[in-house]
Amino acid sequence: MFRQSIVKQSCRFLATKKQPSIGRYTGKPNPKTGKYTVSFIEGDGVGPEISKSVKAIFSAAKVPIEWESCDVSPIFVNGLTTIPDPAVASINKNLIALKGPLATPIGKGHRSLNLTLRKTFGLFANVRPAKSIEGYKTTYENVNLVLIRENTEGEYSGIEHVVAPGVVQSIKLITQDASERVIRYAFEYARAVDRSKVLVVHKSTIQRLADGLFVDVAKKLSSEYPDIELQTELLDNTVLKTVQHPEAYDDVVVVCPNLYGDILSDLNSGLSAGSLGLTPSANIGHTVSIFEAVHGSAPDIAGQNKANPTALLLSSVMMLNHMGLTEHADKIEKAVLTTIASDAKNRTGDLGGSASTSSFTDAVIERL
């Protein structure tokens, strides 16, 4: 009960202002303006609308940031989807980006743009916090989960082929190097946010070599972190326990291979908020990091002033914390969460309210 009361009182999506020692932001402000430059990928569908909301709120909060528009419309190089050189140069120069939802074009040869971004910039860790919002009632209360997903390999390696008519083989790639960097990041993250356990979620009873390697790497690394307890758990057990008793994981940083993390993180979002429209996300690399809303581009409501900008706003809060701009992060996060908790008229339709994108934005600005 004591821990639950602490969870409920705290509004922060990141439990501390400290950041892991791996993947730290090293960008510097413009010496003339005192502002940092951030690449902004507005995205597709509702992306431009929710991006406009973020820009308005950042302006009202006087955040020392200049946005650099970044077009990642896919191009083909040697038959494969890639990102235009100016976009790559912008993100490599600024070391940080905020990204709205992207739609992957349909057709042979097109690869997910999200996957392309992760590969291009070596974004090895996907950090997904999922936390209840005080004052906004959902089925579960006091959810406070953190999941770190390996972001570059596993079943998402894109290695599959037709063996024979009606038979397809898809290869799950697990490497020691990729496993070590994401697990090490999980330990460092646990230290930074004052969580005492790292939980490796796996299925090594079936995937003895692939998941077995992932678990073995974690066990070897754990000796370097005597202050953090290493635990391991089968995927199906984690799913069951998370649904039954999510509070059991409120002192834990979960880390897992790519596919498991993709599924578990959406489950966590459903438990904490009932909607991906409230879920922030960070993609961390050694030098570059990209923060993104995890929901889709929602073309069915694009241009109708109905989209919920909260996920992108909270992702921008994670970005500000990552940059060390914690006072601005706190101010915006508090304004967003108190707006959602205030009244149904200030919530967008996906949260059972009547607010438009623009009226929600105005309500947040009023609370800054």
Curated annotation (Swiss-Prot):
Cofactor names: Mg(2+); Mn(2+)
Where substrate binds, per the record, is at R118, R128, R149, D236
**Keyword list, A-Z:** Magnesium, Manganese, Metal-binding, Mitochondrion, NAD, Oxidoreductase, Transit peptide, Tricarboxylic acid cycle
Top-level taxon of the source organism: Eukaryota
| Catalytic activities | D-threo-isocitrate + NAD(+) = 2-oxoglutarate + CO2 + NADH
Cofactor binding summary note = Binds 1 Mg(2+) or Mn(2+) ion per subunit.
Give the Gene3D superfamilies listed for this entry.
Isopropylmalate Dehydrogenase (3.40.718.10)
Record-level Gene Ontology MF annotations: isocitrate dehydrogenase (NAD+) activity; magnesium ion binding; NAD binding
- Looking at its record, which EC class is this enzyme? oxidoreductase
The record's section on InterPro entries has:
IsoCit/isopropylmalate_DH_CS, Isocitrate_DH_NAD, IsoPropMal-DH-like_dom
Q: Which compartments does it reside in?
A: Mitochondrion
Xref: SUPFAM superfamilies: Isocitrate/Isopropylmalate dehydrogenase-like
NCBIfam families per record: mito_nad_idh (TIGR00175)
Full protein name: Isocitrate dehydrogenase [NAD] subunit 2, mitochondrial
State the organism named in the record.
Kluyveromyces lactis (strain ATCC 8585 / CBS 2359 / DSM 70799 / NBRC 1267 / NRRL Y-1140 / WM37)
